[in-house]
């Protein structure tokens, strides 16, 4: 019987995640006819005892076109974001800080447990058991599948800032096109509720700040948990201060079960990846260089420019070869279950300390994560990119082949230009820290940094998002025959040759010397 129940639970878990090969729902007609894009700030702020949650309006036209919702949570020291689950998959980027997070997968075993001598109660030993708890750090991408309970905790003095994208157009979302948070505790306001009312949604109950247990009758919960009424009242959030909110302060901090070697690394302030399987997978990249940005820049600038350019190209070529090799192996023997749900890797670091996929010491760096790097993203149908640009450096005009891109500025500011299918400029302005810009699929975009260092994270609505460059080596123009370029643009052959070959860079173009002198 127990075996059947476990099998049933695991089957249910696969059903939760099993939309991995389903198509993403398409936007409604005319939703993506955007004449103007805007760099948006959060327009809703909900304070909590231990932090705050800010949200962007998901009814905004550009978010509706992309089918996503965006939010940002800030956790103070010893703050816990209460467990919740969502009606759509999430990608969470850790902009600042480090701490713990956990997820609960139905049917998976409780693999972490306390020592026997750790706790006693009512004359018998009790050992806490639970599913795996992970550490996160700045630069991590965390993948949260639909319906999976998620929580996070900040055990450090530095506030944690986590930016979350919810893919509400995912085929795994069987509700309406509105993000929903199902909290397991508290009686606070649901962060996207006000937008639901703006959209014309009906008020479901008088008290709209209750948790998922609040609607059950007490006797049901007393029988279900075999506990007394006092505990049930706490479970339902009765008489709790609404100001406690979704992020609560933990007096004295949480006691987290964690392997000793991980605790030791954390106490030493180690920047290494903490999961052994991540270390093994990423070791070749770290051997190629895992120093901080400034150290790499100083070392690399002593190299001749042609060597640096070749290094950038080789790095990208290696990335492409890795992708093609992985894709080939999966086509040959892919059953869709290379890793089980219970042991799936849920995070990967793409921050500035990780080895970049594209690097130019005079221009900047880019790091991407797709389902080839983090297989759980195949369930979510999402990917991400982290990049930084030096002052006046440029990311050449390009477009996303198969994904919408939501660019969130982390630091500094840059000038971006976005062009639609009619050749009209739909955005020509600055994107500064804390703002977000949606770039729809196939819209062309280029960026130039206006700060000493502009950094961003881009969430993409495809687990293998691809880019086509419109300028530079290996670009669309560069790969057209010379005579085709000349005839297409009505150029002389020598002019066409200049158009194809004058930019020796692939992605990142350093500032011109005249611009450097002017900025100095």
From Swiss-Prot:
Database matches in InterPro entries: 11S_seedstore_CS, 11S_seedstore_pln, Cupin_1, RmlC-like_jellyroll, RmlC_Cupin_sf, Seed_Storage-Functional
| Cupin type-1 domain boundaries | 37-233, 348-497
Please give the SUPFAM superfamilies that the UniProt record associates with this protein. Answer: RmlC-like cupins
* Signal sequence range: 1-22
Q: Which cysteines are joined by disulfide bonds?
A: 32-65, 108-342
Q: According to the UniProt record, where is the region Disordered? A: 250-339
**Residue runs in coiled coils:** none
* Gene3D superfamilies xrefs: Jelly Rolls (2.60.120.10)
Q: Any idea which UniProt keywords this protein has?
A: Disulfide bond, Seed storage protein, Signal, Storage protein
For molecular function, the Gene Ontology terms on record are: nutrient reservoir activity
Q: How does it assemble?
A: Hexamer; each subunit is composed of an acidic and a basic chain derived from a single precursor and linked by a disulfide bond.
Q: Which family does it belong to?
A: Belongs to the 11S seed storage protein (globulins) family.
Write out the function statement from the record. This protein found in the seeds of many leguminous and non-leguminous plants is the source of sulfur-containing amino acids in seed meals.
Which protein, by its recorded name, is this? Legumin A2
User: Which organism was this protein described from?
Assistant: Pisum sativum (Garden pea)
């Amino acid at each position: 019987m127990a075996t059947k129940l476990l099998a049933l639970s695991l089957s249910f878990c696969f059903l939760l995640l099993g939309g991995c090969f389903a198509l993403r729902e398409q936007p409604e007609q005319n939703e993506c006819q955007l004449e103007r894009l805007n760099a948006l700030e959060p327009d809703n702020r909900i304070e909590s005892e231990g932090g705050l949650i800010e949200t962007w309006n998901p009814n905004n036209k550009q978010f509706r076109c992309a089918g996503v919702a965006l939010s940002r949570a800030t956790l103070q020291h010893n703050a816990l974001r209460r467990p919740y689950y969502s009606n759509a998959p999430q990608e969470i980027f850790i902009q600042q800080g480090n701490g713990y997070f956990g997820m609960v997968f139905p049917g998976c075993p409780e693999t972490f447990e306390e020592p026997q001598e750790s706790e006693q109660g009512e004359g018998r030993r009790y050992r806490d058991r639970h599913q795996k708890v992970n550490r996160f750090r700045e630069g991590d991408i965390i993948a949260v599948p639909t319906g999976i309970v998620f929580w996070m905790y900040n055990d450090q003095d530095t506030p944690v800032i986590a930016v979350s994208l919810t893919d509400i157009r995912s085929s795994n979302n069987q509700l309406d096109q509105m993000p929903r948070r199902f909290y397991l505790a508290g009686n606070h306001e649901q962060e996207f509720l006000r937008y639901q009312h703006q959209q014309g949604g009906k008020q479901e109950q008088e008290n709209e700040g209750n948790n998922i247990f609040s609607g059950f009758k007490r006797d049901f919960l007393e029988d279900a948990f075999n506990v007394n009424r006092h505990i049930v009242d706490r479970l339902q959030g009765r008489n709790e201060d609404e100001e406690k909110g979704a992020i609560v302060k933990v007096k004295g901090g949480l006691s987290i079960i964690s392997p000793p070697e991980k605790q030791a690394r954390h106490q030493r302030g180690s920047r290494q990846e903490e999961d052994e399987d991540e270390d093994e997978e990423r070791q070749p990249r770290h051997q190629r260089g895992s120093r901080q940005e400034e150290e790499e820049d100083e070392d690399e600038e002593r190299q001749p420019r042609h060597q640096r350019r070749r290094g950038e190209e080789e790095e990208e070529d290696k990335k492409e070869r890795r992708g093609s090799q992985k894709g080939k192996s999966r086509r040959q023997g892919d059953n869709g279950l290379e890793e089980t749900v219970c042991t799936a890797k849920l995070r990967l670091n793409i921050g500035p300390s990780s080895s970049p996929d594209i690097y130019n010491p005079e221009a900047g760096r880019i790091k991407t994560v797709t389902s080839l790097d983090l297989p759980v993203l195949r369930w979510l149908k999402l990917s991400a990119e982290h990049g930084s640009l030096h002052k006046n450096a440029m990311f050449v005009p390009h477009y996303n082949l198969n994904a919408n891109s939501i660019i969130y500025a982390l630091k500094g500011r840059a000038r971006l230009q976005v062009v639609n299918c009619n050749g009209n400029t739909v955005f020509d302005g600055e994107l500064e820290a804390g703002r977000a810009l949606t770039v729809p699929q196939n819209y062309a975009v280029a960026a130039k940094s206006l700060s000493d260092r502009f950094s961003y994270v881009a969430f993409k609505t495809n687990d293998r998002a691809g880019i086509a460059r419109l300028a530079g080596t290996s670009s669309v123009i560069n790969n057209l025959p010379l005579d085709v370029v000349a005839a297409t643009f009505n150029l002389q052959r020598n002019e066409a040759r200049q158009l194809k070959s004058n930019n020796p860079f692939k992605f990142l173009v350093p500032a011109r010397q005249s611009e450097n002198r002017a900025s100095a």
